[in-house]
Amino acid sequence: MSIGLDVGSTTVKRVIVEGADVVSEVCLRHLGRPEALARELCTEARRRFPGRPVGITGSIGVALAERLDARPVHEVPAVALAVRSQHPEVASVVELGGQDAKLLFLDRAGDAEMNDRCAAGTGATIDRIAARLGLAEDELPRIRLRGDLRVAAKCGVFAETDCVNLVDRGAAPEEVFAALARAIVLQNLAVLGRGRVPRPPVLLLGGPHAHLPVLAEAWREALGGAWADRGVAAGPVFVPAYAALFAAIGAALHAARGARRLPIVSGVLDEPPAAPAPRRDPRALASLAARDEPDLLGADVAHLHLGIDAGSTTSKLVALDGAGRVRFASYAPSRANPVDDARARLEALARAVERSGGTLRIATLGATGYGADLVAAALGADVALVETLAHAIAARAVVPDVDAVVDVGGTDVKVLRVERGEVRRFALSTQCSAGHGAFLAHAARASGVPIEAYAAHALDAARVPRFPVGCAVFMDTDRVTLLRAGFDAGEILAGLAAALPRNVWEYVVGEPPARWGRRFLLTGGAHRNLAVAAAHADYLREQVAGAEVSVHPHPELGGAIGVALAAMGATHGPTGFRGLDAARAVRVRAETSEATRCRRCDVGCARSLVSVHGGDATPRELVLGNACERGAARDDAVTGRRGAGHAPNGLAYEVARLFRRPPESASARANAPRIGIPRAMGLYRSAPLLLHYLAAAGVPPDRLVLSPPTSAASFHDGAAGGVHDPCFPSKLFLSHVRWLVRQPIDVLFLPALTHARIAVRGTADTASCPIVAACGHTALAALRRDGDELRRRGIRALAPELTLTDPGRLERQLLDAFGDLLGIDERTNRRALEVGLAAQRRFHADCARFGGRVLREARRRGSAVAVILARPYHGDPGVEHGVSTELAARSIPVLSITTLPADEGGLLDLSGILPEATNSGAAEKTWAARAIRRDPRLLAVHLSSFRCGQDAAVASTLAALLEDLDRPSLAMEDLDEDRPGVSFGVRLETFAHAVRRYEAGLGAAREEVVA
């Protein structure tokens, strides 16, 4: 008999094992007291079974081994030991815990993988989202896999926002939870599998698997498809008894074998770094304190100006008097659809007015937040405003000459650069939850501190431990580690408050705060916490010489106050608000399902169809979630015609001409091999050359098989099998390859395009990104990692190196690759290459002519033009997520780098700027930035994929060229597999508003060169 303890980030588990049988089990949450609870359970077990060996494991347990006189073992061997004891037939194990995930391959020399950079896809994410969806704990085991909604689980906090938004838009909570289960499975397959697929039998362990049958269903669905693709016979995927206790069982078995104690490595587990708490002037501290909640209604209030912030996590309402003073505020977590939440806030106002003895008279109503359009349509708002602009208006009302507004909310961060009252640039969080306020509330609860007392505890701390910046869930693990190291709750809360500004500026913004100005206004609910406000002010004063930092008097209400002020200033006649009685009667019906998905292009946007009726409102039907105007119509009978305000889109023009089918050659052979080519990565630069070359070499165009444009479905179908995870486009490439190998093709053509032929000169080289050049080989590695899938399907792989900058070398490379395959000689090969090169030249000439026409028309109309600074593969609508289409739909003409005319005058020569540059994409972006700098009608829209190393290297050069221009700009530098619709809409609408204001001042002013 032996005793096993598993002390993890949230629970302590204890088992007593006799032989291979579990005779006793306990699982308790430790609530921030892991050592005390582990000691209590260990002491009790030793009292009952004296002299029995004790093993211990878990993220916290190993560090407690010496103090508890237990034998430590790491979680992975502990789980493997228990599995071999309980289920020796198992080949693969997937374990999900509260904050970690593991994949064990027991049939392959014991390989194991764990999540390393992010805790998305673990139990903590599931628990939090289930609570937000209003699903009771006893409901979760009854949920089954159904529907076809999609949720991105790359970050747990943003997965939560996706899920809540889907429910708000009419999706059934159970169906959304099923979508979350699918997303978590795909996330773990991608992060843990790295191209390897678990072989059957597969054992599912951990608390989430033990309690949620829908997860097991999702694993069976995903693995069944993966096994079918690879020709692997299907097998069992099951959850065993004691699924949550296998690590503890393994620890007990480890101890029973008389295992030695692990040596302690000095220096590795030293006390975490901490600094003495800063000494703050009480008066300076008091100046950062937010005001108490307003409750100033009285009989004297005749007319109120209302602002509603229909946020994804919180619904807020403020009432201003004619002088702009806040007389009433109401806010609560968002629970139903935005209209129902707004109605609840209005009822709270009506009750407060009635208690005060006054009469409710509403002069104006404004709406902002993600639900603003719906609230405005249902209630008759006078103004609907994007939330960035609302925050800027509220900030200017407090600090008229503010430079930067820093809004930290529960699940998002916004930083706005304000110049002469206009938002010139901004940064919003999209792909990671680091730096958000919701985690602080969670940490306070977990530490037993009421959120209202957070600041008092943190400001009283003697020490401030240093937390690393990054994932909020991993920071929670660090919180538990610090508790174990002897830091008290107040010190830990102080450390978290100090980490927040570093997360905002280092992780979300990615730039020094000095680039954003000197006068900062802090807003958002997180800054109502005085400890957070003080830490943020300290950070800014350390980073920016002479920084002036203030906190909005009502930081949690900034958006609502701003839109109320906007409505007050914009409404000069009767309000459009239909009245409280009408608000009570209005009804909103929303539907989000696979039936509402847009089918008008391959992207397949997940739309919601919303109908508003009753309460004197004109019946309306709204379409939400569409990325372009083609998806704005409810029925499929609508054609793809552009709306009247649709501007030219150079990126779409470029892509349409890239993939024009070449004419059939007179030498075309009906028996030529069917060649599959992925429509991804380097093909977005070289398609005319390669397609026309192959056609001229004798391949009929109908035997050139291109994968379709990227869609969410195609990505999820293929990306889970990647062998690496550097960036979204590289993962996407494998999805295109997997689509092709399922087609009846003979050859899979994956050229390694090492260099690009570009107009820019004066750099050391024009090499492709190494990931672009190598993506074909990494795709082949993935296809061969679990057996040779290409050989099984009878497909020949062709992955030649092609040097586009050297025609002579390229000619030899193409002959080596296709000479025998197509039966062509040197002469035919040379002529085919000449045809391909001519097609590439025509493509560039067509694009330049299109750009010239757009610029001439813009000058004639006095309008600005957005120039997309992006890599060629961002032309894929699934990679750029429809950014160019949405800009064009907002009447902003769009040019790509390829359609921007290459005007001479020295701009193409980068020898004085980037003489040592080697990357072609970086060189093209720099040239385009110089062109933008010269022409005041051109506005920069920078697109970059999340974690793009090549773009990071040129970021400072682009900033130096663009940041001092007094023009609107848009940075979408974190494009990834998920498209956070709320954040995208906010950024695009903010930019569009700034462009309209800029054009009003631009007029027909003559061009001037910016020195």
Question: Language-model features: where?
Answer:
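Phosphate/ATP-binding catalytic cores across multiple sugar-kinase/actin-like superfamilies
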Residues: 179-200, 286-294, 348, 352, ...
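An N-terminal assembly and electron-transfer interface module characteristic of large anaerobic redox
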Residues: 115, 119-125, 230, 432-440, ...
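Adenine-nucleotide phosphate-binding core of ATP-dependent small-molecule kinases
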Residues: 161-192, 477-506
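Glycine-rich phosphate-binding loops at beta-strand->alpha-helix junctions
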Residues: 60-61, 193-223, 240-244, 368-372, ...
